[in-house]
Amino acid sequence: MPNYKLLYFNMRGRAEIIRYIFAYLDIKYEDHRIEQADWPKIKPTLPFGKIPVLEVEGLTLHQSLAIARYLTKNTDLAGKTELEQCQVDAVVDTLDDFMSLFPWAEENQDLKERTFNDLLTRQAPHLLKDLDTYLGDKEWFIGNYVTWADFYWDICSTTLLVLKPDLLGIYPRLVSLRNKVQAIPAISAWILKRPQTKL
């Protein structure tokens, strides 16, 4: 088993999907969390100057979803068939497209607040309606078993609920999916032991 070192800020953010996958697959890794004050000196040393990165076998891998795909490849978390793998990727990319619209680093607070409000009140309902329709009466997004698309939904929706606690009020099936992910023993154990951060 390779030695893994995950580098990210002390927050869930874009690294949490990697941590969920490590937890579920029971893979040991170093969860290295850096302070914001140290970021300016660390940034120039990394590929493309972004985190998270995963150090493995002398390589520094970047892009959280690429890392997630690397870790889930050849496991059922990625989907059992090529068609299911495409469906998993499509749900993940749909969620990521939306989450990437948020101007997390915007310094103009008025603009940031207006944009967040627009995304949460006007655009999120369209996404949630589509996700609810896609899920339907199934237990999981794809197939009859958990995939990392379900993990990513739980992670993204946790952040969205911090920003707008009533967001899922009319989507009990999406809430139920969150609950099912969080009830998986390995995920539940991780949630209990992880550092408590807002985002």
UniProtKB/Swiss-Prot annotation:
Residues 2-79 form the GST N-terminal domain. Gene3D superfamilies: 1.20.1050.10, Glutaredoxin. One of its GO terms (biological process) is prostaglandin biosynthetic process. It catalyses: prostaglandin H2 = prostaglandin D2; RX + glutathione = an S-substituted glutathione + a halide anion + H(+); 2-glyceryl-prostaglandin H2 = 2-glyceryl-prostaglandin D2. Changing residue 198 to E: Moderate reduction of protein expression levels. No significant effect on catalytic activities. Changing residue 199 to F: Moderate reduction of protein expression levels. No significant effect on catalytic activities. Its main location: cytoplasm. InterPro entries: Glutathione-S-Trfase_C-like (IPR010987), Glutathione-S-Trfase_C_sf (IPR036282), Glutathione_S-Trfase (IPR040079), Glutathione_S-Trfase_N (IPR004045), GST_C (IPR004046), GST_superfamily (IPR050213), Thioredoxin-like_sf (IPR036249). Highly expressed in spleen and bone marrow. Lower levels of expression in small intestine, colon, liver, pancreas and skin. Not detected in brain, heart, lung or kidney (at protein level). Changing residue 14 to E: Moderate reduction of protein expression levels. Abolishes both prostaglandin D synthase and glutathione-conjugating activities. The keyword Manganese does not apply. It comes from the Eukaryota. Keywords: Cytoplasm, Fatty acid biosynthesis, Fatty acid metabolism, Isomerase, Lipid biosynthesis, Lipid metabolism, Prostaglandin biosynthesis, Prostaglandin metabolism, Transferase. Homodimer. Bifunctional enzyme which catalyzes both the conversion of PGH2 to PGD2, a prostaglandin involved in smooth muscle contraction/relaxation and a potent inhibitor of platelet aggregation, and the conjugation of glutathione with a wide range of aryl halides and organic isothiocyanates. Also exhibits low glutathione-peroxidase activity towards cumene hydroperoxide. This is Hematopoietic prostaglandin D synthase. The gene is Hpgds.
